[in-house]
Design a protein with these regions (language model features):
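Short pre-active-site segment immediately N-terminal to the catalytic Zn-binding motif
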Residues: 172-191
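Surface-exposed patches in mature extracellular/periplasmic domains of secreted proteins
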Residues: 124-141, 203-204, 208, 272-280, ...
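Active-site recognition of the HExxH zinc-binding catalytic motif
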Residues: 186-206
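Acidic/polar, low-complexity intrinsically disordered N-terminal segments immediately downstream
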Residues: 47-128, 285-288, 292-330
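Post-HEXXH active-site segment of zinc metalloproteases
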Residues: 204-227
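Sec-dependent bacterial lipoprotein signal peptides
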Residues: 1-10, 15-45
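Metalloprotease/metallohydrolase-associated module, dominated by Zn2+-dependent proteases
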Residues: 221-292, 321-326
Length: 330
């Protein structure tokens, strides 16, 4: 049968070819291994023929860092007690490249470092103890001399990154000879308390009922303006009060609203707070009070911090700034 013969032939000739192919593969594998071994030997030989490795020098600087008196002061007052890296020399890698920035002046950095320690850090230490601050304080402070402006024209006062780092801008605007408490609060301390409160609520969240008080009124990134028949108008704090917000920025979102209550309360007098509530009107004041009750209870019950006591300490320390030598490093 021709067909069966063809099948036999096909079956006969195909099988030996498969065995032969397998053998070829084995041979090729061995040849490849020998080639790689030979290549490795050549490379190692070439390396041995190169100049000896210079172990006496490193591509990394091993020279001791030269510290000035301010650096030593920062070690004693920030680094050793709290493990804080206080960066007053602007580092490009630590800066936000979308802004045009300049470094902080040395004298301004010295003054602000003393003010921050006395008014902000030591206030929490006085009330809650040094261990509390050691655990929760951001480990990096970065000072920038110039303001940071968004494309919208808004000036960024400060930023925080994951509870690890706080950047303060516009340091060069600090007038050491004429201390302005309101300006210090606006530029620095409202920001410091604001960002620190973020760290705390990210560790232990606040009552979610807070989010529902002004639900539907948050405007996100549009917090800085509102629309009228004449067009967009800047939204100032007093514009936000009747809507139940302590600042215009509090209208961004609930988390910002929460921490703005803390920042504004502890940095301002009761007279300021009462005037704000009156200007807010009955509805606005009721909303602010409802929110602040949650804020106050959270700080007291969760962290053992009475905001009334913290405010007394902060306001007292603000008045003591004029008694501090802001220029001399001892």
């Amino acid at each position: 049968n021709p067909n069966s013969a063809e099948c036999d032939r096909g079956g006969y000739t195909t099988q030996p070819e498969k065995k032969l192919t397998k053998k070829k593969v084995e041979v090729m594998k061995k040849q490849l291994i020998y080639f790689l071994l030979a290549l490795t030997a050549v490379c190692l030989g070439a390396c041995n023929n190169d100049d000896e490795i210079d172990t006496a020098h490193s591509i990394f600087s091993t020279e001791p860092v030269e510290r000035n008196a301010f650096d030593d002061w920062l070690l004693d007052n920030y680094t050793y007690p709290y493990n804080i890296d206080f960066m007053y020399r602007m580092k490009d890698i630590e800066s936000d490249h979308k802004y045009n920035l300049v470094p902080a002046d040395y004298d301004k950095a010295v003054a602000l470092s003393k003010i921050i320690k006395h008014v902000w850090m030591d206030a929490y230490v006085e009330l809650a103890g040094i261990d509390f601050l050691r655990v929760y304080v951001p480990k990096t402070f970065h000072l920038i001399g110039s303001p940071a402006y968004e494309s919208s024209g808004n000036m960024v006062l400060g930023t925080a990154e994951g509870g690890k780092k706080i950047t303060l801008y516009n340091v060069n605007d600090l007038n050491v000879k004429k201390i302005n408490i309101e300006k210090l609060n606006n530029y620095y301390f409202e920001t410091m308390h604001h960002e620190f409160a973020h760290i705390l609520h990210q560790k232990r969240n606040f009552d979610p009922s807070f989010n529902r008080i002004s639900e539907g009124k948050y405007v996100g990134a549009d917090w800085y303006y509102y629309m009228t028949a004449e067009g967009a108008m800047p939204r100032t704090n007093d514009i936000a009060w009747p809507d139940g917000f302590v600042t215009a920025y509090a209208m961004n979102q609930a988390n910002e609203d929460f921490v703005e209550n803390i920042a504004m309360y502890v940095t301002h007098t009761q007279t300021y707070w009462d005037n704000m509530l009156r200007a807010a009107g009955e509805t606005g004041a009721a909303t602010i009070n409802k929110k602040f009750t949650i804020v106050y209870n959270y700080m007291r019950d969760t962290w053992g911090i009475d905001l009334n006591e913290l405010r007394k300490i902060v306001l007292r320390r603000q008045q003591e700034i004029t008694e501090i030598d802001l220029s001399t490093i001892q």
